[in-house]
Amino acid sequence: YSLMGGLTEFAGQLCDTLNRTTGRTAVITDRDNIISVSGAPRRELMDKQISPDLERLMEGRQIYQHKGGEDGIPLCDNDGRFFLDTVAPILSEGDVLGSVVFTSPEDELGGGEVEYKLAQSIAAFLGKHMES
């Protein structure tokens, strides 16, 4: 059972907004799976299990952004097509509920400050929303 499950439609609207604002593929996950996608690969990514590396990043409770020259970290388990560009964990009352992610193929990685701040803001908003 996912606490984020009830937010699927709302998360979809947020992903659409992030995608329109940045032109990047935006994803929202719960602790196990992708619950919302906006951008090119929606059908390929929706409901897929997240990678163990993404789980570890979320548990670290810090925002992650790919740095040039580093190997890409896969978004999904057993799927090397999409990689983590920017990840902000969704925290509610100290618990990790999921993450806001910008993703792209490995050769297109390169999020900047805009993606960082947007992911941070949406993750904080969702965390607060879940507390109420």
Question: Could you tell me what each predicted segment is?
Answer:
Residues 78-82, 111-114:
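Short amphipathic alpha-helical interaction segments
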